[in-house]
């Protein structure tokens, strides 16, 4: 049996070793685990902070870091009575906007974590989408297809239009902040002029829900994800009908986030996050996945180093996308191959806790083949391959 003195010496040695232990630096921040499914996430525009809203109506603010053990919850809010559908930071990062199934709009002070403004019954039905246009103007869309555009200086909406027959899934606007676009569960793209405060047109009805919308290719193309796994492409000022479309070989394309002018990340109900090049249309590879869990939303951080994702596994995961802007896509369509595995675009593409090697190829292996499997087979349903 060791003497008391020996025990004390060992204890002091362990404390000393812990004090001088070098913190582990990770490629990406650790996963954040919540107690409910997270519907929505947003990165702070100036700091390493992430906001999240869950199906219970709770909103959380986290600081994140690549130093192991340094992710911290800064505050939480339970002001929403039902599921939180969307969170967004103001451009200066001082305010956090949120919308909910409870039909309310909340604006919170980010530093204090306090509710500053509440607009109850902002819509007659649950709110599903939101876009911040500038420091005073924002837009919201609801479950029945109504679009509202708000002026915070007056605290009221100055546009209240219903032209969609189903929920508004996403909203975006052009750089001039003149033409506002909506995607809808009725399968149409909506076009609105917020300068003249009027509705312009709806596109032709596509096959299945339009789940997301983004403007790409220096403002010349509008890209929509869809519930049946097809990406639809419209020409700017040619919103009536698609100019191109291609199947992504995914169950759905539920959320899209542009990374460059040509490359976007797309999340699906199959749990996989794909990098996709637009014109030429190619699935470049996989960023990562939530194994077997539907992804609700993805978001890009301010310096395009990380992508975050939230899914039905109640996890927020971070992915390294810093090399994605350097990906090159060949215009030339090679002969289709039977091997339809995705190229892994991050080290964590394999980090799933299960055997994901069966579905992915390592980047080093891929480079050794000189890009022979350039995902050319994934554009087999595309109507065109170049701009």
UniProtKB/Swiss-Prot annotation:
One term under GO cellular component: nucleolus
Major localization listed first in the record, in broad terms: nucleus
Mutant lacking the gene: phenotype: Death between 10 and 12 dpf. Thymus size is remarkably reduced and the pharyngeal arches are malformed. Eyes and swim bladder are also reduced.
Bias type Acidic residues, positions: 372-387
Ranges of the WD repeats in the UniProt entry: 33-72, 79-118, 122-160, 163-202, 205-244, 247-286, 290-329
Keyword presence, Transport: no
Domain of life, source organism: Eukaryota
SMART domains from the UniProt entry: WD40
Record InterPro entries: WD40/YVTN_repeat-like_dom_sf, WD40_repeat_dom_sf, WD40_rpt, WDR55, WDR55_POC1
GO BP annotations, alphabetical order: chordate pharynx development; eye development; rRNA processing; swim bladder development; thymus development
Annotated Basic and acidic residues bias: 1-10
PROSITE patterns (alphabetical): WD_REPEATS_1, WD_REPEATS_2, WD_REPEATS_REGION
Subcellular location, record wording: Nucleus, Nucleolus
Chain segments carrying region Disordered: 1-24, 356-387
Keywords: Nucleus, Repeat, rRNA processing, WD repeat
Pfam families registered for this protein in UniProt: WDR55 (PF24796)
Keyword Nucleus: yes
Function: Nucleolar protein that acts as a modulator of rRNA synthesis. Plays a central role during organogenesis.
The family this protein is said to belong to: Belongs to the WD repeat WDR55 family.
Protein name in the entry: WD repeat-containing protein 55
